[in-house]
């Protein structure tokens, strides 16, 4: 297993305008599922063959959050979202790349640029492949959502030994009635329940960042306390 570690220089934080960020990376050529799981449990995130975590000086606003699947019950509003999507076709498959994917990705980010002032980058086929397809091994999947044979949402996930790691989701803003972002996460929870998995790893919760603060609404959940290196025994998550 080839592994290369490196860090970025300090840069503007993408989540908080008054903060600076620094990121630690691991490039892992062919990452086994169990190593992926151990890294995710310790606050890392996977994109392609790269794993990353923040190592920012004097800041700990990025908190790893996971949903407790076995204790999670759908609310009335969440059941309404599921009912609205009764005719939405959901396919679980290995990560894919097509013109449809890239068009939907671009449409979603143009919308978010206008709505939430996200910084948008044009993504090529190669860049998308490197971020969301490469390195899927025996754990990477996408949930593809279709309404009337139109691809309207893609949710990229890793199915690990103790849970599902939610990597990235994008959807067609023209179908806002269907609450596709919420519906995709509810599908993750349903899949985890069927597979007897304990957690949905949602990535980073940042209280002062609107795009990430919503994650705390999914309860019960736990927050990772501190950081641990790979194979250090005790990893502490607290409600």
From Swiss-Prot:
Gene Ontology annotations of biological process type: ubiquitin-dependent protein catabolic process via the N-end rule pathway
Any one Pfam family match given in the protein's UniProt record, by short name: ATE_N
CC per GO annotation: cytoplasm
Alphabetical list of InterPro entries matching this protein: Acyl_CoA_acyltransferase, Asp_Glu_LeuTrfase, N-end_Aminoacyl_Trfase, N-end_Aminoacyl_Trfase_C, N-end_Aminoacyl_Trfase_N
Reactions performed catalytically: N-terminal L-glutamyl-[protein] + L-leucyl-tRNA(Leu) = N-terminal L-leucyl-L-glutamyl-[protein] + tRNA(Leu) + H(+); N-terminal L-aspartyl-[protein] + L-leucyl-tRNA(Leu) = N-terminal L-leucyl-L-aspartyl-[protein] + tRNA(Leu) + H(+)
Keyword vocabulary terms for this entry: Acyltransferase, Cytoplasm, Transferase
EC number(s) per entry: 2.3.2.29
Purpose of the protein: Functions in the N-end rule pathway of protein degradation where it conjugates Leu from its aminoacyl-tRNA to the N-termini of proteins containing an N-terminal aspartate or glutamate.
Protein name, as recorded: Aspartate/glutamate leucyltransferase
Species name: Campylobacter jejuni subsp. jejuni serotype O:2 (strain ATCC 700819 / NCTC 11168)
Gene name as annotated: bpt
């Amino acid at each position: 297993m080839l592994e290369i570690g490196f860090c970025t220089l300090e840069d503007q934080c993408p989540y908080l305008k008054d903060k600076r960020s620094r990121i630690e990376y691991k490039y892992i050529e062919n990452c086994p599922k169990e190593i992926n799981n151990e890294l995710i449990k310790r606050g890392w995130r996977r994109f392609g063959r790269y794993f990353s975590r923040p190592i920012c000086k004097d800041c700990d606003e990025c908190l790893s959050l996971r949903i407790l699947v076995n204790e999670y019950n759908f609310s009335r509003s969440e059941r309404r979202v599921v009912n609205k999507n009764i005719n939405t076709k959901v396919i679980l498959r290995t990560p894919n790349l097509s013109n449809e994917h890239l068009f939907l990705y671009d449409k979603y980010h143009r919308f978010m640029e206008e709505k939430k002032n996200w910084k948008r980058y044009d993504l090529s086929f190669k860049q998308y492949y490197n971020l969301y397809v490469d390195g899927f091994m025996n754990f990477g999947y996408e949930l593809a959502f279709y309404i009337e044979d139109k691809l309207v949402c893609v949710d990229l996930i890793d199915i690990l030994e103790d849970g599902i790691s939610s990597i990235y989701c994008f959807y067609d803003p023209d179908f806002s009635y269907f609450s596709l972002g919420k519906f995709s996460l509810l599908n993750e929870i349903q899949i985890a329940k069927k597979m007897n998995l304990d957690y949905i790893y949602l990535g980073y919760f940042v209280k002062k960042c609107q795009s990430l603060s919503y994650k705390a609404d999914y309860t019960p959940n736990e927050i990772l306390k501190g950081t641990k290196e790979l194979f250090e025994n005790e990893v502490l998550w607290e409600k």
